[in-house]
Amino acid sequence: ITLFEKAQSIYQDLDNLRLLADNLARDPRAKITLGCLPSLGLSLVPELVTDFYQQNSNLVMTLTTEHTETLVRKLDLREIDLALTLQPVQQGEILTTLIAEVPLVYIDRHYRRGAVDIGQIDQQRWISPGPHSLSAAIATRRDFSTTRLNVQTYYMATEFVKRGMGCSITDIFSAQHNLAPEMIHPITPPIAINLCLLRRADVSLSPMAQKFVD
């Protein structure tokens, strides 16, 4: 199975998340405030919400992008109903539901030789994707030393790679959104991070939504 087939299968596997949103939307006064990471807001989330938004004319939806720490704080303050992140959260009243495993990919404008062994990535060209779950997943396979170019969002890493400034690792959705297929390569052995749905444990959802979360 190719990387792109894997990404498409994840879209198809997110039926439970669509069901949750659809049941929230059945309320005639339905309002959903969804927060997500910036990279997901540019790639995965628009794909997810478009269909059910169009099918539910009563739905009022607000979308916001923040880093995970801010999303958790907004959940605590009840400023958002749900959040999508690429890491589980164990904090206070926050419940985490694993939605899918998202492949990580090697991105490089100048590489053309198929799958990449993470140990063979050129440290001198490495663009650090920042201190978050993606970097933690990478660190389980290889510890990259301090680099000249460090970014705080996956999307920014793809922009620098597009300009030939170096190489990095990112999630398949951010890569597909911003880069040509020939710049995106599998990693061996494969690495994945978790796409997670966060919500407050003390906020009730519809019966069907509650069944999904349980």
Positions of PLM-derived features:
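Alpha-helical "hinge/linker" immediately C-terminal to small N-terminal DNA-binding modules
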Residues: 1-23
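Short amphipathic alpha-helical coupling segments at ligand-binding clamshell hinges
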Residues: 2-6, 44, 48, 138, ...
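Central regulatory/effector-binding core of bacterial HTH transcription factors
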Residues: 19, 29-91, 151
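Flexible hinge/capping segments at coil-to-helix
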Residues: 25-26, 91-130
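Hydrophobic hinge/microswitch elements
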Residues: 67-72, 76-80, 86, 132-185
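Beta-alpha-beta core module
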Residues: 91-98, 102, 156-204
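Short helix-loop capping/hinge motifs at secondary-structure junctions, enriched
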Residues: 110-118, 190-191, 202-208
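Secondary-structure junction motif
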Residues: 118-146, 154, 205-209, 213
